[in-house]
Amino acid sequence: MSATGPISNYYVDSLISHDNEDLLASRFPATGAHPAAARPSGLVPDCSDFPSCSFAPKPAVFSTSWAPVPSQSSVVYHPYGPQPHLGADTRYMRTWLEPLSGAVSFPSFPAGGRHYALKPDAYPGRRADCGPGDGRSYPDYMYGSPGELRDRAPQTLPSPEADALAGSKHKEEKADLDPSNPVANWIHARSTRKKRCPYTKYQTLELEKEFLFNMYLTRDRRYEVARVLNLTERQVKIWFQNRRMKMKKMNKEKTDKEQS
């Protein structure tokens, strides 16, 4: 049997064989959405006399709520079946994403959703920024649960508080030396002598004048000199004692020099 004219967009029942209809019906049972109508055998004795007919347009099977399918190249054929309905919060799984069970979690992702880690060569430029001096390596941020990363951070990252504590311990170890070592005692010994308070040039000059007039001062004169020079009586007394010892030494050296 044959039909004349173009057969595009037309269904010619005479070109289809109905011998295997019972076999196909047994393999693919009819569903509720598309019931298979039983075709009586008496209605199709010969279909050559019937003209070709066209079906009316059917309603759309897929609703408009389906998510957009990413555009693909028309050169390569990509067979795919019907996709399930996607929720509003679900993510598309692209070819450059790999699902990992222990990937790093991000705040923008839902808590119960699946996480995807980037491939190692996704950002080659950023790997050079993290050098060995930072204490962090690129794989540490790719794999591992959040708890493992928190436990791993104190081991790899140096803390300023830890460095300060180590420095204080080192100083304490230096201070705690052997007390029986005389060298250590001499190094850490502190002088108990009071800081020396030198006299000014004006005070020294006035004391020298007073010493030329009298090598020994009375109590009243010592009080008057201390009040004029803004000194204490003890300071004036000590200065005169030292000056007398110096004069005695100078006289002795002079006598020895004359005798020699």
From Swiss-Prot:
For region Disordered, the annotated ranges are 120-182
Per the record, the major location class is nucleus
Indicate yes or no for the key word Phosphoprotein. Answer: yes
Give residues where Phosphoserine occurs. Answer: 159
Q: Name one GO molecular function term.
A: sequence-specific double-stranded DNA binding
> What's a single GO CC term here?
aggresome
Checking InterPro entries in the record gives: Abd-B_homeobox_TF (IPR050803), HD (IPR001356), HD_metazoa (IPR020479), Homeobox_CS (IPR017970), Homeodomain-like_sf (IPR009057), Hox9_activation_N (IPR006711), HXA9/HXB9/HXC9 (IPR017112)
Residue numbers of the DNA-binding region are 192-251
What keywords tag this UniProt record?
Developmental protein, DNA-binding, Homeobox, Nucleus, Phosphoprotein, Transcription, Transcription regulation
Localization: Nucleus
- What GO biological process term is on the record, naming one? embryonic skeletal system morphogenesis
A Pfam family matched by this chain, by name? Answer: Hox9_act
Family assignment?
Belongs to the Abd-B homeobox family.
Q: What does this protein do?
A: Sequence-specific transcription factor which is part of a developmental regulatory system that provides cells with specific positional identities on the anterior-posterior axis.
Complex formation: Interacts with Geminin/GMNN, which inhibits transcriptional activity.
Q: What is this protein called?
A: Homeobox protein Hox-C9
Source species: Mus musculus
Species classification: Eukaryota, Metazoa, Chordata, Craniata, Vertebrata
